[in-house]
UniProtKB/Swiss-Prot annotation:
Gene3D superfamilies per record: 3.30.70.520
Protein name (database record): Formylmethanofuran--tetrahydromethanopterin formyltransferase-like protein
Similarity comment text for this entry: Belongs to the FTR family.
Organism field: Methanothermobacter thermautotrophicus (strain ATCC 29096 / DSM 1053 / JCM 10044 / NBRC 100330 / Delta H)
Phosphoprotein as UniProt keyword: no
Superkingdom assignment: Archaea
GO molecular function: formylmethanofuran-tetrahydromethanopterin N-formyltransferase activity
Classification via InterPro entries: ForMFR_H4MPT_ForTrfase (IPR014053), ForMFR_H4MPT_ForTrfase_C (IPR002770), ForMFR_H4MPT_ForTrfase_fd-like (IPR023447), ForMFR_H4MPT_ForTrfase_N (IPR022667)
Amino acid sequence: MEINGTLIEDTFSEAFTGRCVRATITARDMETVRRAALDATATPGAVIGRVEGGVESFLGGEDTPDGRPGAVVQFYYALDDMEKFQVELSYRIRQDILVKPFTALYSSTPDPDGYLDMMKHVGHCGDGYEWLEEFNGREMINVPVAVPDFKIESRMGYREAIMGANFWYMCRDPDTVLEAGRAAIRAIEEVEGVVTPFDICSAASKPETNYPWIGPTTNHPYCPSLKEVLGDESRVPEGVGYIPEIVINGLTMEALEEAMRAGIEAVCRYDGVLRVSAGNYDGKLGDHRIDLHGVLG
């Protein structure tokens, strides 16, 4: 298959099941919202047993629970230990959202499978002076802080979701890495229910490693700088000098497939993109398979 002269390999992306909390951050102004949203979702850590997240969209006051500027963010956890998820999520909330002036956080997860209690690891930042209050049908924790006050919904809904869907766009030159990648991110941002936790990712990884205490390490057959060293083991095609990756997490498979299609079609508008592929690891990463040709029809 080709799109605009770009070869689409007959392969698939492997993805895996996780848990997602979808939430809405609000603040007095959009600059504060943006800083809180980007800070809270800045470190993708699912492959090392931590939380990872992304910004789904930014909102005007007409679309938020309290009429202020806002952002929809998603936080993902790949393990079934919900207590650990609660702790890891609290770090993002406490260190990146609560500390920003005039912020609030509301649960926005559609059809939640369950809830994470926010009092133990976030509400008690008030050192016992926090209190509960009702706001527009939501139970909120008011955490007293020096710039009054941080408010967070007492329970955050979570649901099963899908993590790690991906595609690689193999480029001839460095300008195309950035230009095509940014076009893909913009296209994916138009799809509801998905995030790109790594933005443009320069470091595709693999499950096998010589250093297990690190976790996933570089996918060496796809490193252009190792092509001569590896010889026949190298999987870097002729003419390709760069293999960036776009990783997508989503609430549903339908949203993920729509995002994959939008992103791939976007990169294929650039002459410097020679082919598109995806990461899969013989089922070692996850139990979801997204065929590139199937997604593109």
